[in-house]
């Protein structure tokens, strides 16, 4: 009953956004709008919104898949914009969410089959062109769309906004689970949808404080078929044109996996990286605000689905926007051209006590860096308040010229752990003359079977970023052992000692002193 009521409310909102029913009937718009239920093979009904051009077909098709927790009308603004450009648009809620029946499978086999079912329905019930089909989505819809391109050769283009390529890598990095992001997804999924028994089991298992090796392996195996990298051979065989747009500071799906995916794709491709957090760059466009992110989607579909404007194909396929603030985009012919040469910073010995938190942290999932996308200001920490008993802190001399960080920072620590298990979190800051650090990047690392008192090598590969440190500022590295974002393995306190060789490699372009 509640879901039905939401469906009615959503339809009323769409009437307001797209124009009254009377206006539509009078031909005030170049397309008609209707709401349908698309029957899936297993009897599940998928709630969908269909925008069909009034002109004679056949029309290029744009299938828009809802994000986590969303329904058919979540993409109403992009749907209208695509319909205005002559597309037959079918926007639907993924099963288990919105107006759709069934249960949330997290990009399971049924979710992937649903994409083909929606395409089948469009071809059978509208003037859709089977040779011109594109699929797009934000977050959850992006992940489903990428995998579907490997299952259905009719999909000629994909727009993946804040999506993932490797689900296991998204859930955990360096033996450290993204606990707070996982909790947000679990609770929002429960509140806004119907989780399948398997999804419920895996997500609750993932949130167990001290996960067993067997349960960890079970989650990895569950994640594999839900990851585009597992279907890369079929995706490349079908050669869809793939557009990925990712934020630098993703707390759900870090951008490094999208770099790897881009480099592995053999068909037409484009990758854009912008400041912000999960889904922040596309949110304005979903609300009807001007959006360069959605403009790229429309142009990508025009080139590779409708065939009406191929100008985007003549541009450099790698687009990056540096932090902080709003900087002009930098374009590159390939990823190698986008990144800088590493400069090594040798770190002197240090030690601190494990198990106590400090003001250094990665922020709040989906909020902290979304605010940065709006204001241009990264999250900050006042470094003089970071206790040297609870963290190791290294700082460079103030810069005489700007430092243009481009690419992935790399670190190596040689530590002597006090216990068999433990976690460290490394933060890299841009620090001003007052000691206020703006967060450039961060990364956790956990060990679960170390020999106490014996040196342990820790290698960290941060997600890539583009960040310009102003002249007069300095780079600082802070390492502590607690962060609300992560489920750590610090079961007891003890002194963690850093010794040589320990270093941080910073990739820079055109930077001196």
Report each predicted region and the residues it spans:
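Gly/Ser-rich "nucleophile elbow"/oxyanion-hole loop immediately N-terminal to the catalytic nucleophile
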Residues: 55, 105-111, 117-139, 155
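A short loop-to-beta-strand scaffold at the N-terminal edge of the catalytic core in hydrolase folds
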Residues: 42-52
């Amino acid at each position: 009953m509640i879901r039905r009521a939401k469906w009615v409310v959503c339809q009323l909102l769409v009437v307001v956004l797209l124009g009254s029913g009377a206006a539509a009937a009078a031909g005030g718009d170049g397309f008609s709008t209707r709401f349908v239920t698309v029957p899936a093979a297993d009897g599940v009904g998928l709630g969908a919104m269909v925008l069909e051009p009034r002109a004679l077909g056949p029309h290029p098709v744009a299938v828009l898949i809802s994000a986590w927790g969303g329904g058919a009308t979540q993409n109403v603004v992009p749907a209208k914009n695509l319909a205005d450009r002559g597309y037959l648009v079918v926007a639907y809620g993924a099963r288990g969410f919105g107006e759709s029946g069934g249960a949330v499978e997290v990009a399971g086999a049924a979710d992937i089959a649903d994409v083909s079912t929606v395409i089948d329905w469009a071809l059978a019930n509208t003037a859709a062109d089977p040779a011109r089909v594109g699929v797009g989505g934000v977050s959850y819809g992006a992940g489903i769309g990428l995998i579907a391109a490997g299952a259905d050769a009719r999909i000629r283009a994909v727009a993946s906004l804040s999506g993932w390529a490797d689900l296991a890598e998204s859930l955990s990095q360096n033996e450290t689970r993204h606990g707070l992001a996982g909790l947000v997804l679990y609770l929002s999924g429960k509140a806004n949808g119907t989780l399948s028994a398997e999804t419920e089991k895996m997500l609750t298992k993932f949130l167990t404080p001290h996960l067993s090796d067997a349960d960890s392996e079970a989650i990895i195996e569950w994640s594999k078929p839900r990851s585009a990298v597992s279907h890369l051979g079929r995706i490349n065989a079908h050669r869809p044109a793939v557009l990925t747009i990712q934020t630098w500071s993703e707390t759900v799906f870090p951008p490094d996996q999208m770099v790897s995916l881009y480099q592995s794709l053999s068909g037409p491709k484009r990758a854009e990286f912008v400041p912000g957090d999960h889904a922040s760059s596309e949110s304005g466009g979903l609300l009807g605000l001007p959006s360069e992110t959605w403009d790229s989607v429309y142009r990508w579909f025009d080139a590779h689905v409708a065939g009406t404007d191929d100008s985007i194909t003549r541009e450099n396929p790698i687009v990056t926007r540096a932090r902080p603030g709003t900087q002009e985009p930098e374009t590159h012919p390939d990823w190698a051209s986008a990144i800088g040469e590493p400069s090594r910073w040798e770190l002197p010995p240090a030690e601190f006590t494990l198990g106590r938190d400090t003001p250094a942290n990665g922020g709040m999932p989906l909020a902290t860096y979304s605010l940065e996308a709006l204001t241009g200001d990264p999250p900050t920490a006042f470094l003089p308040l970071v206790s040297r008993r609870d963290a190791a802190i290294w700082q460079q001399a103030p810069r005489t010229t700007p430092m243009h960080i481009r690419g992935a920072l790399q670190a190596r620590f040689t530590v002597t752990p006090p216990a068999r298990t433990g976690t460290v979190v490394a933060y890299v800051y841009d620090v001003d003359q007052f000691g206020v650090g703006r967060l450039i990047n961060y990364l956790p690392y956990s060990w679960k079977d170390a020999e106490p008192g014996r040196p342990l090598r820790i290698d960290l590969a941060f997600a890539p970023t583009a960040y310009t440190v102003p002249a007069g500022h300095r780079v600082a590295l802070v390492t502590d052992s607690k962060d609300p974002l992560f489920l750590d393995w610090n079961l007891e306190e003890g002194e963690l000692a850093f010794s040589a060789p320990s270093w941080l490699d910073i990739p820079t372009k055109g930077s001196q002193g």
